[in-house]
Every structure is written in C-alpha cells, then in structure tokens.
Amino acid sequence: MVFRIASSPYTHNQRQTSRIMMLVLIAALPGIATQLWFFGWGTLFQIILAAVSALAAEAAVLQLRKQPIAAILKDNSALLTGLLLAVSIPPLAPWWMVVLGTVFAVIIAKQLYGGLGQNPFNPAMIGYVVLLISFPVQMTSWLPPHDIAATAPGLLDALQVIFTGHTASGGDMNTLRMGIDGISQATPLDTFKTSLHAGHAVEQIMQYPIYSGMLAGAGWQWVNIAWLIGGVWLLWQKAIRWHIPVSFLVTLAVCSTLGWAFAGDSLASPQLHLLSGATMLGAFFILTDPVTASTTNRGRLIFGALAGLLVWLIRSFGGYPDGVAFAVLLANITVPLIDYYTRPRVYGHR
C-alpha cells in the first residue's frame, strides 16, 4: 500500500476557486446596480472593457508561458480583477485608461509573479494606483449623482464620451460634471478635503449640494450600503471570513470618531468615512482577497485594523481624498511579517 505524504493544512474547503470567485462576482451586483443608477451607463461600459481586457491579457500571457488557457481563465480571477478596477474609476474615464490599468494589473501585478496565488499585492489596486498617479485629473473626474447633476448623460452620450471625449451635442466632461448649482462637482471626500484646504468651515461644507442633507453624500451613501449588502451576503455564503471587514470597519469607525470628537472643525465625521468613497467595497471585496491578505485569524484582525488606520490617516492628513487603494497595498506589504508572528504554534514545540 502506498501512502501519499502531504503537507498541512489537512482540512480543506471543498469549494473551487472558480466557485468562490463567482460568488464574489454575484455579490457585486447590488453595488454595480447602484452605481449604474446614480452615475449612469458609463460604469457598465467600463466593466465590459475591463472584462475583455483582463481575459485577453491573461490569455496572451498564458499562451507565452505555455499554460492551459481555458482551464485557468475559468477560475474567474481575471474577471474579478477587471470588475474591481472598473467600479473604482470614474464611469466616463477614457476607454484606454481602463484597458491600460487592467492589462497592467493582470500582466505585471499578477502574472509576472507567477499567476493566481503568487502575487503579493492586490492586482486591481495596483492597476488603480498606477492610473491615479499617472492620470490624476481623469481619475478624479467623477460625475455628480443624477439627482443633483445639471445634465445626466444617457446611454449613447456615455458611450461617446468614453470613446471620443464629447457627447453628441458637443458637451465634454466639464459640462457633465456640473451640478444643479452650476458648480463642478467632485466626490464627497474630495469635496470635503478641497474645501477644508480652501478655508471653509465643516458646517459650511456639509451644506453643499453633494451632501444633500445625507450622512455621507448624495449617491455615495447608497452605493456603500449596496456594497455592504453584497459583503454581508458573502459572509453568509462563507465565501469570506468576518475578521478583516469587521476589524477594518471598527478601526476606521473608532479612529474617525476620536478624530471628530477632538478636531471636528478639521476632520470628517465617522459616517462620512464609513459611507463614502470605497469603504465598503474595500472592506468586503478588496481587503478579503485570500491571496494578498493574512492567512491566520489573528493576522486577519491585525491586517484589517492596519488597513482601517491607514485609510483614516490618508484621508485625514494625506494628499488623496480616499486612500483605500494605498492602504490596501501598504497593508499587503506587512502580510509576511504579520503571518510570521501570528502563525499557530506547532504542537509539541515551544
């Protein structure tokens, strides 16, 4: 009789990688639908461009590496990378930007390290940061939600802006970014940071149309709630574990509450931090990436808490209004160290 000697762990989750990735894609539907509702058809076009680019880039690299193309593409990891990048960029960003970011994410941040399971950094966030640093104007040109927009682009207008930079009537991004008050709009976090630097008081800032009397800004509050719903469904399906999203959100809430209590005239409120920007997307869909996150339960708690702290620090004192992507990548750097000091003790060893 021949016994096969295998290394630990000896218990395994029977779900295949493709199944888990598909669950994440399904869980993203509420967030995608909400972004489509508030920001228009551009989000859908960006997702399609990113998906095609991700599959094509991965297939090309697999062909060069003489790897089985069909079998690897079926794991859905390339699709998920493209999706996460597409929903993170402005819906009317030029078509070549999402293609460039997706190709960079798949080829450089994933396949260059050996493919799925070998990459130390989240590929989608690598692609996002490359685009943000290289094209800061285009990457911060978010449309105002449709309910406060002076002009809401339709299906054909969105398609034309993405591929030509202009609508059928000759309008451009500057026109489309105008709010009902005739002022060019930005995201709630960007508006808050920019207005503070301009010397405006917090009470005055929160009266801007972008906030519309809501806790965290028109549109963005509901987008984050939608991503939260998808994240809770992932927890219920046991596709992800609770440690990272809970520690991330708790740390962000605690830091922002303390900051707001002691410096409310210069720092954002907890509800703005929790329900604006990419908070819920990052908590449940990006930080929980099993490849680039910590692998122990204690390590996951530390990893999530570190990311939450970094998001608050970057948003409050850094040069970028959101900071989730940078926080994720900085936390990814610490994963080997976290895992080293939180790995379970082997029975019988000190």
From Swiss-Prot:
Its EC number is 7.-.-.-. Its main location: membrane. Keywords: Cell inner membrane, Cell membrane, Electron transport, Flavoprotein, FMN, Membrane, Phosphoprotein, Translocase, Transmembrane, Transmembrane helix, Transport. Its cofactor is FMN. It comes from the Bacteria. The keyword Transmembrane helix applies. Pfam families: NQR2_RnfD_RnfE. It is found in: Cell inner membrane. The modification FMN phosphoryl threonine is found at T187. GO terms for biological process: electron transport chain; transmembrane transport. GO terms for cellular component: plasma membrane. Part of a membrane-bound complex that couples electron transfer with translocation of ions across the membrane. This is Ion-translocating oxidoreductase complex subunit D.
